[in-house]
């Protein structure tokens, strides 16, 4: 089996370069979007006495730079406003015109001590000056039929059993140089193979402008929670190690369930019974001892979900993947010999593997951490799973999956999936953060994959960012560039802050660099070794 899931981008931000501010922000730092000729990352002391209105005022003041084509308050809608862990106010805005949101055009504003300190994200310039149609010529139903037919013809080769996905909506899609009115259609299905496809359908003529699979992969006698008493059971995982797990005893049913009531809104583990219907049945046992071989995948999925919850809570102050203590649900024994695991947008799903290429996927703690980090990304930056933004999405999951493994101190290393991949081959893994080239992945931007396979190389080009993260943590010399390591903890803090507070759906590698530099400055000071090490690490992999 090919180790990379064969999953192609919205090019809001292509090559970036440093650019000076206008007179009103003299001497500040800016990263420039070469495609749209507008800023994608701005930092420094911008304006004081900040509020939503101040952000609008600054953008209007810099109208020749941002080229919004109208008043900022008419083009940007506030969609989020919160305080972060450092006491900074973080506001998220979406660009819209004629009530249609602009796909991926999100702006994040940071306020520190009452002063606007940074803007990140890329906006589409001069929409009011373009011949942009704002009324659709085809209906929602027609757009949905076109997307479903394309799935049947080109993806599954048969009509899939579609599930309810995100509602179809009209958006402004930045199709190369000409933004277009388009329908965003979500086609979600589990058979014949799982998929969570996003389609951009031209609202004028029904043409498929773009499509990608947003399925984030690694490569009581029912589904409802039960009322009962919290207990602790014991069992054996996929690799034969014993674990204590939080369960719930229902006196009504007389069974112990894999339902952990001690963390957030609960952790629930289900038995898929080798079918493809989710979530399956809440796992039940008669004596609270889970030592049967069939139990092993469930023991690990349940236990490791708790470890991931604890990592994000204790290290980053994050309560579950959504930040609001959402329940974590996992299904094991999905399908027969299914060689993958995925986050489907609402829960975790683990295949059993075929016993040769893979063991049950829940047996790898870094795999569980990887997949649940996709959920964190969904609720924060929302990185589009295609091209560079998709590779960042994958790299974030590799980074935090690895950090979870170190946090739990379960034979930690810088390999991905080594515990469950090719059980008959020692020393093998899906990917390596320390040496991406070991498994054929690029370790420098000059070696990046530029084709369309794997959604534009999301599982391949992630190696570039993985190497940067490894160098930032451990240090070393790479392509002649010396990097001073700052340790895993600080590296994780920097990448987490970049993910949650600076990245936007279409961020590319250069924007990630700028976000990590700013995150390090926020945490450790603008003249700190940490900031210098971030720059060194990205220099070493050719990302500027």
Swiss-Prot record:
Report the InterPro entries cross-referenced here: PepSY, Peptidase_M4, Peptidase_M4/M1_CTD_sf, Peptidase_M4_C_domain, Peptidase_M4_domain, Zinc_Metalloprotease_M4
Q: What class of enzyme is it?
A: hydrolase
Q: Quick one: which residues bind Zn(2+)?
A: 370, 374, 394
Q: Which PROSITE patterns match?
A: ZINC_PROTEASE
List the active-site residues.
371, 459
Reaction(s) this enzyme catalyzes, per UniProt: Similar, but not identical, to that of thermolysin
Q: What is this protein called?
A: Bacillolysin
What species was this sequence derived from?
Bacillus caldolyticus
């Amino acid at each position: 089996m090919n180790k990379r899931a064969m999953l192609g981008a919205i090019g809001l931000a292509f090559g970036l370069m440093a650019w000076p501010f206008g007179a009103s922000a003299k001497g500040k730092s800016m990263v420039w979007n070469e495609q749209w000729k507008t800023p994608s990352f701005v930092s420094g002391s911008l304006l004081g006495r900040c509020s939503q209105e101040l952000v609008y005022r600054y953008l209007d003041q810099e109208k020749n730079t941002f080229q919004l084509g109208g008043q900022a308050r008419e083009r940007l809608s506030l969609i989020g406003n919160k305080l972060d862990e450092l006491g900074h106010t973080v506001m998220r805005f979406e660009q819209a015109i004629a009530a249609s949101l602009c796909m991926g055009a999100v702006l994040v504003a940071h306020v520190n001590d009452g002063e606007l300190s940074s803007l990140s994200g890329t906006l589409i310039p001069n929409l009011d000056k373009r011949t942009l149609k704002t009324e659709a010529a085809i209906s929602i139903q027609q757009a949905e039929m076109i997307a479903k037919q394309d799935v049947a013809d080109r993806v599954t080769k048969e009509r899939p059993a579609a599930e309810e996905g995100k509602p179809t909506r009209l958006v402004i899609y930045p199709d190369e140089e000409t933004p277009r009115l388009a329908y965003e259609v979500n086609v979600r299905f589990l058979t014949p193979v799982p998929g969570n496809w996003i389609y951009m359908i031209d609202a004028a003529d029904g043409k498929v402008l773009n499509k990608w699979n947003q399925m984030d992969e690694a490569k009581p006698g029912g589904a409802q929670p039960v009322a009962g008493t919290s207990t602790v059971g014991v069992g054996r995982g996929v690799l034969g190690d014993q674990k204590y797990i939080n369960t719930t005893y229902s006196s009504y049913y007389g069974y112990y369930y894999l339902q952990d009531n001690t963390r957030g809104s609960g952790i629930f583990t289900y038995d898929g019974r080798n079918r493809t219907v989710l979530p399956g049945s809440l796992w039940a046992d008669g004596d609270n001892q889970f030592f049967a071989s069939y139990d092993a995948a469930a023991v690990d999925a349940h236990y490791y979900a708790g470890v991931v919850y604890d990592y994000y809570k204790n290290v980053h102050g994050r309560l579950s993947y959504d930040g609001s203590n959402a329940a974590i649900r996992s299904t094991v024994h999905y399908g027969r010999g299914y060689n993958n695991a995925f986050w489907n947008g609402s829960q975790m799903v683990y295949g059993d593997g075929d016993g040769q290429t893979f063991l049950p996927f829940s047996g790898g703690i870094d795999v569980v951490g990887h997949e649940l980090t996709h959920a964190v990304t969904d609720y924060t930056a929302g990185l589009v799973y295609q091209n560079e933004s998709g590779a960042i999405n994958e790299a974030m999951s590799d980074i935090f999956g690895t950090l979870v493994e170190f946090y739990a101190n379960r034979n930690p290393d810088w390999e991905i999936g080594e515990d469950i991949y090719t059980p008959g081959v020692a020393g093998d893994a899906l990917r390596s953060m320390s040496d991406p080239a070991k498994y054929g992945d690029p370790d420098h931007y000059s070696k990046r994959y530029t084709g369309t396979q794997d959604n534009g190389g999301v599982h391949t080009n992630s190696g570039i960012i993985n190497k940067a993260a490894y160098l930032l943590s451990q240090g070393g010399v790479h392509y002649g560039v010396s990097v001073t390591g700052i340790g895993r903890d600080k590296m994780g803090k920097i990448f987490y802050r970049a993910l949650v507070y600076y990245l936007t759906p279409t961020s590319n590698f250069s924007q990630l660099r700028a976000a990590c530099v700013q995150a390090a400055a926020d945490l450790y000071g603008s003249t700190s070794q940490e900031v210098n090490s971030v720059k060194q690490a990205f220099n070493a992999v050719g990302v500027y």
